[in-house]
Amino acid sequence: MMQHPSWPVGLILSGMPALRDMLNFDPQLARRVIPIELPRLSPIGDLEPLTEMTAFYAQEGGLAPADPAENADIAARLIQAADREFGLAIEITIDAVEEALRLGSSKPSRDHFAAAFARRSGCIDGLNPFIIGEYDRLDVRKLLQREGER
């Protein structure tokens, strides 16, 4: 990577552990990288921060946050829906806020998150973590599932 004082470039690389291995393969690149690793989300330790995050994005979109009990339920389901990945949780939240705005709602609801997840994954309602009761048993990485294909 070339560096030029009048045109500085900064890269943000996001990926799996294999990306870190690739960066470490090149000593020059490894010297120029500041790695920041985000741990996987936990339904125990990260519920409150995700509840705050969903409320933040709702307010940034000009909406009221969901009611506290519903917001906590949304956050728990969001951790599962995002496969415990923080960046994906943010993307789904933004999509849900956009869905609420598109429908003229005053605040995001679980239905908006369900629609955002369905649009992203293509899954049916019976496999949507924002709809079903036992959402924590779903393998959300299997996209475009249909009933009977589990």
Feature map (PLM): residue ranges:
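The catalytic "switch" region of P-loop NTPases
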Residues: M1-A69, D73
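C-terminal alpha-helical "lid" subdomain
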Residues: P43-G45, T51-R150
